UniProtKB/Swiss-Prot annotation:
Residue intervals on the Cytoplasmic side: 1-11, 153-745
Comp. bias intervals (Polar residues): 705-745
Reported function: Acts as a processive, ATP-dependent zinc metallopeptidase for both cytoplasmic and membrane proteins. Plays a role in the quality control of integral membrane proteins.
UniProt name for this protein: ATP-dependent zinc metalloprotease FtsH
Biological classification of the source: Bacteria, Bacillati, Bacillota, Bacilli, Lactobacillales
The family this protein is said to belong to: In the central section; belongs to the AAA ATPase family.
Essential cofactor(s): Zn(2+)
Native organism: Lactiplantibacillus plantarum (strain ATCC BAA-793 / NCIMB 8826 / WCFS1)
Length: 745
């Protein structure tokens, strides 16, 4: 701290001395010209001019023990002055003069006699009360003011108006985090157990490196956290800082680059210099893709400064001098654009993928965020976790926050299941538009449209189940149907993809069958279905004509759509792709048409129920499909308990394990009798036509499913989308992270 203050003082003093020197030089050479209006003459010269009758008037004023004499000539006089080097300047004309004389009676009498002789007006003034100090202040005050303004301007120049001082803009903005203020611990990070285990080693190494050093292990140079937005990468870094108890420097990738050339590299050097002084320590760079993008991709010299900063970062992380005792943690959701030199071992030794949580992870995340929220007895967090596949931690936190806001708006003391259900709909499709005026024909069109999605989803239900269908307008959607996967999926099979496309086509097929017309309400359905079909052909190798080849990936497709790249295949191949996409879409449309034609009665029942009740849940939909009636109301329909603590969950797990062990032991003792008395219990379900009896496994990894399953950017295994039936230009109203919920409009 003292070094920084000394450096600041030296820099400030340097600029002040430069300013004073410049003023001295100007005064040294040109100060002689200041007398061009009033000529300063000797007393003898004054007496001589007064005797020659060249003086018009005179003023005499006591000042500091002498008399100050000022006056004016009768005619302008030509004078030439010289500067401090004796060099004469140009001649000037003057009419005023000034001089001093001794404060005695003889000099005063002499001047008075000469003035009376030539009729010169003499004026006597009182002595100045301010004295010489006021005079000095009048001359010095403007100089001091100018120096102060100059100092303030230079102090603000470093950071564009920031709080740093002169020449301090090359210093890093990262400051060691205060461990007392950071309350985040690993226990606050749920749903990422494997990721935490990888980081536990880093924390233990920083606390006690002897266990690792004894085995010849070295401390990792860097840890890269990559994954979709909202999965908790920054929260993990905060938890590491809270657990490690070592100096933690946090900075954003964009903070390295400023308007001045070389500032980024200077800040990198200063950051690592501070971290090494406080070693062992951790440096966390959030959004490192802002400074770590691959070099050589810029056009012209627009990226030279960023590349210079990246080069300095590469050297600091693993250069000639090494980087002992400093661990670099970085977070990004665009690891594909990072420079290969930054990703190699020795710089980022460990790459941790922070993915989307599974159903258990979502339940754990919900429990963490529900700690400070009073939940009613009918809230089942496990059920909510099942209903939110694809949601990340940020989405789940937002879901509970929306539910709490709704409960407060309704003047409730607790957050109940109705609040959470409404919050889920708001997050997926936006707020409800109950007051929107919809004419009778459009309302019927929306009802039969959504019933078409529902019927196809009920028939092709090997992998997905219909969770909810509604015709209440939300956002830009006139209605929507939510299809949930039976369990978390990481892959998508060809059969599953075709079933999803058929479900999306169910709305248009129902409109054509019932009304013999087409509306714009299916536009969003076509958008999703086309994306799935195109991904099947160009990315997943599910086309017999084109075979198992990858013709484009998500990045190439985005660049081509923005006009920044050329197609990677010929025009003939492009025509084949279009033909295959059209064929798959037409097959899905025909499948949906056949299913609705063969289930016209159930389709009508569900549509009429939607017109009456507006929203149907899973139990009501299944009852209408199987029995043709709405289910009876049950007060204990949703039995649930409050969110369990860790110890309660552990005891419950032990109890279930004990019961399971006892049942297995009993089965072994009575194997013969149990074989005769075992009753096969099966749920009575209708016989639904399907393509095969095989289980619906999926064959696309989570990084590719975003194109196949939703209009969102993030990598998922299915989709959430809404479209407004009967409303043109309907757009998806879903967050990019909850793609596992198939909401078809």
């Amino acid at each position: 701290m003292n070094n920084r203050r000394n450096g600041l003082f030296r820099n400030s003093l340097f600029y002040i001395l430069m300013f004073l020197s410049l003023m001295g030089i100007i005064y040294f050479f040109f100060g002689g010209n200041s007398g061009s209006q009033t000529q300063n003459i000797r007393y003898s010269e004054f007496v001589k001019q007064l005797d020659k009758n060249n003086v018009k008037n005179v003023s005499i004023q006591p000042s500091g023990g002498v008399y100050k004499v000022t006056g004016s000539y009768r005619k302008a006089r030509t004078t030439s002055s010289a500067n401090a080097l004796g060099i004469k300047s140009a001649s000037t004309k003057t009419t005023s003069f000034s001089t001093t004389m001794l404060e005695n009676n003889s000099t005063v009498d002499q001047v008075s006699k000469l003035a009376a002789k030539h009729d010169v007006k003499v004026t006597a003034k009182a002595e100045e009360s301010s004295g010489i100090w006021v005079t000095l202040l009048m001359y010095i005050a403007p100089v001091i003011l100018m120096l102060f303004l100059f100092y303030m301007m230079m102090g603000q120049a470093g950071q564009g108006g920031g709080n740093n001082r002169v020449m301090n803009f090359g210093k890093t903005k990262a400051k060691p985090a205060d461990s007392k203020q950071n309350k985040v611990r690993f226990s606050d990070v749920a749903g990422e157990e494997e990721e935490k285990q990888e980081l536990v080693e880093v924390v233990e190494f920083l606390k006690d490196p002897r266990k690792f050093v004894s085995l010849g292990a070295r401390i990792p140079s860097g840890v890269l956290l990559e994954g979709p937005p909202g999965t908790g990468k920054t929260l993990l870094a905060k938890a590491v800082a809270g657990e490690a108890g070592v100096p933690f420097f946090s900075i954003s990738g964009s903070d390295f680059v400023e308007m001045f050339v070389g500032v980024g590299a200077s800040r990198v050097r200063d950051l690592f210099e501070q971290a090494k002084k406080n070693a062992p320590s951790i440096i966390f760079i959030d959004e490192i893709d802002a400074v770590g993008r691959q070099r050589g991709n810029g056009m012209g010299g627009g990226h030279d400064e960023r590349e210079q900063t990246l080069n300095q970062l590469l050297v600091e992380m693993d250069g000639f001098t090494g980087n002992e005792g400093v661990i670099v943690m970085a977070a990004t959701n665009r690891s594909d654009v990072l420079d290969p030199a930054l990703l190699r071992p020795g710089r980022f030794d460990r790459k941790i993928l922070v993915g989307r949580p599974d159903v258990k992870g979502r339940e754990a995340i919900l429990k963490v965020h529900a700690k400070n929220k009073p939940l009613a007895a009918d809230v089942d967090l496990k059920e909510i976790a099942k209903q939110t596949p694809g949601f990340v931690g940020a989405d789940l936190e937002n879901l509970l926050n929306e539910a709490a806001l709704l409960a407060a708006r309704r003047n409730k003391k607790q957050v109940d299941a109705a609040d959470l259900d409404e919050a889920e709909d708001r997050v997926i499709a936006g707020p409800a538009k109950h007051d929107r005026v919809v004419n009778k024909h459009e309302r019927e069109t929306v009802a039969y449209h959504e019933a078409g999605h529902t019927i196809v989803g009920l028939v092709l239900n090997d992998a997905r189940v219909v969770h909810k269908v509604t015709i209440v307008p939300r956002g830009r959607a006139g209605g929507y149907a939510i299809m949930l996967p039976r369990e978390d999926q990481m892959l998508m099979s060809k059969r599953d993809a075709k079933e999803q496309m058929a479900g999306l086509m169910g709305g248009r097929a129902a409109e054509e069958i019932i009304f013999g017309a087409q509306s714009s309400g299916a536009s969003n359905d076509f958008e999703q279905a086309t994306q799935i079909a195109r991904a099947m052909v160009t990315q997943y190798g599910m086309s017999e004509k084109l075979g198992p080849v990858e013709l484009e990936n998500a990045n190439q497709q985005a660049a081509y759509q923005q006009g920044m790249g050329a197609s990677a295949f010929s025009q003939h191949t492009a025509q084949l792709i279009d033909d295959e996409v059209r064929r798959l879409s037409q097959e899905a449309h025909q499948t949906a048409t056949d299913i609705i034609e063969s289930h016209r009665e159930q389709h009508k029942l569900i549509a009429e129920a939607l017109l009456k009740y507006e929203t149907l849940d899973e139990k009501q939909i299944l009852s209408l499909f199987k029995t043709g009636k709405m289910p009876e109301k049950d007060s204990n329909e949703f039995p649930s308990e409050k969110a369990a603590t860790f110890e309660e969950s552990k005891r419950e797990l032990e109890r279930r394990e004990a019961e399971k062990h006892a049942q297995n032991q009993s089965a072994d003792d009575k194997q013969a009798d149990s074989a005769d008395t075992t009753t096969n219990v099966s749920v009575a379900e209708p016989s639904f036509p399907s393509e095969s009896d095989a289980s619906s496994e999926v064959s696309a990894d989570s990084s590719v499913n975003s194109t196949a399953n939703s209009a969102t950017e993030s990598a998922t295994d299915s989709d959430v989308a809404t479209s407004a039936t009967g409303l043109p230009n309907a757009e998806s109203a879903t967050p990019s992270s909850q793609d596992d919920t198939n909401s078809q409009a």
